[in-house]
């Protein structure tokens, strides 16, 4: 059973992007927390300004939050009791392999290999089309004693950093990961739910970004809210089909990390994926949008998701349409017409079978 009355934890958040910073801010309101940045200049700026001026400008960070650019210092901050420590990874998918290899090397030297580790990245690895848990397994294998999981859900970093309400899901096969994350974050403005469905939680977080790009394109074309609702609903079916083929549970996609995250990312004004889609629908070129500094995980992982699905024999028509528009020069309205021209089919439980 999950409980929230555990003694104070010591928490190291590795990665000072928007989401790592937001979670560090939330955790530091309850427990001693250190945020690790890759560069000394960024760590110094965070410490002096008490603000992440690059990723979360205008959001004041709690006075108790500490900063460092030294990974050894960040791990030493955890102390010597792995049962009273937690590592939160705020690095992107592309950085997962290297940071896990570092932890697999450094934690045993401190007698801290049992420290719970949870990652927060969403998406597929570009070259391999692997989900984060698959990257971890390939990097460190079943390292004796290491307990890992994923933290995900419908959340914009800025709102979490500001202390606004949010509900998240932690998924792991290890109960101590679920206990640690719940103790670290649950309470006040953050509600934490537990799951054991790691692939399902990761799939929801990955594919919702692609579907959000599609919804943005639809909105940019002024196709109306009916069209957006159709894309969200059919996108959920797409996500579920794909997830089942990777061993996920269907009911996971009706929860926070499936439907919840999809609705937020497809409709929210802070959604970068939706924003890219809006610009595409309005006629701008992808290269111009990306050159302006906008980043969107849905753009980065769309082709990897489609390739992985094809290898499993899973049909992803919306994802395929997004790839055609983003990378093959297909006009947005042409892609919409192709989706509308697909054969009629029955909706229901058979619709999501892999």
UniProtKB/Swiss-Prot annotation:
Pathway: Membrane lipid metabolism; glycerophospholipid metabolism
Keyword Nucleotide-binding in record: yes
GO biological process: carbohydrate metabolic process; glycerol-3-phosphate biosynthetic process; glycerol-3-phosphate catabolic process; glycerophospholipid metabolic process; phospholipid biosynthetic process
Cited Pfam families: NAD_Gly3P_dh_C, NAD_Gly3P_dh_N
Subcellular location: Cytoplasm
Gene3D superfamilies referenced in this protein's UniProt entry, alphabetically: N-(1-d-carboxylethyl)-l-norvaline Dehydrogenase, domain 2, NAD(P)-binding Rossmann-like Domain
Catalysis: reaction(s): sn-glycerol 3-phosphate + NAD(+) = dihydroxyacetone phosphate + NADH + H(+); sn-glycerol 3-phosphate + NADP(+) = dihydroxyacetone phosphate + NADPH + H(+)
Residues binding sn-glycerol 3-phosphate: 122, 153, 155, 208, 261, 271-273
InterPro entries found in the cross-reference section: 6-PGluconate_DH-like_C_sf, 6PGD_dom2, G3P_DH_NAD-dep, G3P_DH_NAD-dep_C, G3P_DH_NAD-dep_N, NAD(P)-bd_dom_sf
Protein keywords: Cytoplasm, Lipid biosynthesis, Lipid metabolism, NAD, NADP, Nucleotide-binding, Oxidoreductase, Phospholipid biosynthesis, Phospholipid metabolism
Coarse class of the protein's main subcellular location: cytoplasm
Catalytic residue list: 208 (proton acceptor)
UniProt-annotated binding residues for NADPH: 18-19, 38, 122, 157, 272, 297
This protein's GO CC annotations: cytosol
Source species, domain of life: Bacteria
Disulfide bonds: none
Function field: Catalyzes the reduction of the glycolytic intermediate dihydroxyacetone phosphate (DHAP) to sn-glycerol 3-phosphate (G3P), the key precursor for phospholipid synthesis.
HAMAP family: NAD_Glyc3P_dehydrog
Name by which UniProt lists this protein: Glycerol-3-phosphate dehydrogenase [NAD(P)+]
Organism: Bordetella avium (strain 197N)
Gene: gpsA
């Amino acid at each position: 059973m999950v409980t929230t009355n555990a003694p104070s934890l010591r928490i190291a958040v590795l990665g000072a992007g928007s989401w790592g910073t937001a979670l560090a801010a939330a955790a530091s309101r309850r427990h001693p927390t250190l945020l690790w940045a890759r560069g000394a200049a960024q760590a110094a700026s965070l410490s002096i300004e008490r603000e992440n001026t690059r990723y979360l400008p205008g959001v004041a960070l709690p006075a108790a939050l500490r900063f460092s650019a030294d990974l050894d210092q960040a791990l030493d901050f955890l102390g010597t009791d792995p049962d009273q420590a937690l590592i939160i990874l705020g690095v992107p998918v592309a950085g997962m392999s290297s940071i896990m290899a570092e932890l697999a090397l450094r934690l045993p030297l401190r007698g801290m290999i049992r420290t719970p580790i949870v990652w927060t990245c969403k998406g597929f690895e570009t070259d391999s089309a692997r989900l984060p848990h698959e990257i971890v397994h390939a990097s460190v294998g079943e390292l004796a004693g290491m307990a890992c999981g994923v933290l995900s859900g419908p959340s914009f970093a800025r709102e979490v950093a500001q202390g606004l309400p949010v509900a998240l899901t932690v998924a792991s096969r290890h109960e101590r990961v679920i206990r640690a994350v719940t103790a670290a974050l649950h309470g006040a403005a953050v509600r934490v739910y537990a799951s054991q469905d790691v692939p399902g939680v990761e799939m929801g977080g990955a594919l919702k970004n692609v579907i959000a790009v599609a919804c943005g394109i639809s909105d940019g074309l002024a196709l109306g809210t009916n069209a957006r609702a159709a894309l969200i609903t059919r996108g959920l079916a797409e996500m579920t089909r794909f997830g089942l083929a990777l061993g996920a549970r269907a009911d996971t996609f009706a929860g926070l990390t499936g439907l919840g995250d999809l609705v937020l990312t497809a409709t929210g004004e802070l959604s970068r994926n939706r924003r890219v889609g809006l610009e595409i629908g309005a006629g701008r070129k992808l290269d111009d949008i990306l050159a302006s500094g906008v980043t969107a995980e849905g753009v980065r992982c769309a082709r990897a998701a489609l390739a992985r699905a094809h290898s499993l024999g899973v049909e992803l028509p919306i994802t395929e349409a997004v790839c055609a528009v983003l990378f093959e020069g297909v006009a947005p309205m042409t892609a919409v017409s192709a989706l509308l021209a697909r054969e009629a089919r029955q909706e229901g439980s058979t619709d999501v079978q892999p």
